[in-house]
Curated annotation (Swiss-Prot):
GO terms for cellular component: cytoplasm. Belongs to the TmcAL family. The gene is tmcAL. GO terms for biological process: tRNA modification. Its EC number is 6.3.4.-. It comes from Thermotoga maritima (strain ATCC 43589 / DSM 3109 / JCM 10099 / NBRC 100826 / MSB8). Keywords: ATP-binding, Cytoplasm, Ligase, Nucleotide-binding, RNA-binding, tRNA processing, tRNA-binding. This is tRNA(Met) cytidine acetate ligase. ATP binds at G95, N161, R186. Transmembrane segments: none annotated.
Amino acid sequence: MEYNPFHNGHLYHLTSARELVKPDYTIAVMSGNFCQRGEPAVIDKFARAEIALRMGVDVVLELPVVFATQDAGGFAFGAVCVLDATGVVTDVVFGSESNDIEFLQRVARILYEQPDEYQKFLHEELKKGYSFPNARKYALMRYFSMKGWNEEEVLKLEKSNDILGVEYIHSALKIGSNIRFHTIKRVGAEEKDTSFRGRFSSATAIRNLMREKRWEEVRDSLPEDSFEILMREINEGRGPVFLENMGDFLLSFFRLKNMDFFEKIHGFSEGLEKRFHVCARQTGSYRDFLECVKAKRFTFSRIRRLALFSVFEVNKEFVEKSNTKGPQYIRILGFTEKGREILSLMRKKAKLPIVTNMSLYRKVLEKTDLPVDKQLFLEQIDLDVKATNFYSMFFPSVEQRCGERDFSIHPIFLRTEM
């Protein structure tokens, strides 16, 4: 989840998920301060975790930045690995436009098994110049047609939640997880819908309302507690944070780098390093820079992710290793009194070390006897800290911009009111 911000659709998903699987506890794995579309969250991860707890989540875990800022495949892989590593998660419920779990499982199985015919179709579609998501869609349509299945079904994968759902199931197959997957029909506006649609407006639309300071419409789109905490963060100068706030810095940073620098960064290929190098010098705003880099084959989300990888100097080897070995720790962002119970069980059953107090993460690493890659553990957690330090520099209030928030803020603990 991203909860950027936590809106009525998220509350519907959470409530429906509880009704569907009747869990003893509810755990959410959430992006930190940067999200999968390559953008900053409008308020920071601690405030968003607090909202999730107030809305009924028992434990909020952080998805490490190296996964939270990847494409759908990397994002889903990190999330499923974290949930599986808790040792206590049995079911995952995700929102879906199609609400067709059998179709999503069929596609995930194709992606996992990689039949020769599918690989051939994918290669041919990529050669036509399509972006990877579109090339994969067309390759799947051809594969479905070859099998005598309804190829029009593949058009469901044009929707963001269904794409992510396929990747969740695919990731579980890759790691041999026994987690059961369920879908909840997405309600309200589509994710990319930029218009206000009342109670069930999309997160994209809500962020646009925030840009325009249309607070009454924002209030209508969020649960009461979510709106209350959002406004608290804004009034105290810790939000909202938008990508455009970072634009001048990002463009300046890119102008200082040569193509050799970009070639070492994860995700740069097909001439993108040259496009970054040239466009940074030919444009005067970050918006114009994105338009300059954009081509038929590259999505804006991909370009924004590459921009973040560049600033954080995320190299290819680090991401490849992370995508092979997965997250190396479980970071706790917050929990309720009820959540304490499941945390106690997690400490006995978890497959990865649990980091609750960030000031002690090195001791956690030294003491663990779990099979983790210690160097990768340090690299992943270092990126999380780096991302938080960078993010806080763009708080509206100068007084709030102090660094090391990962160490000064402890996990949110929500007590049950008497």
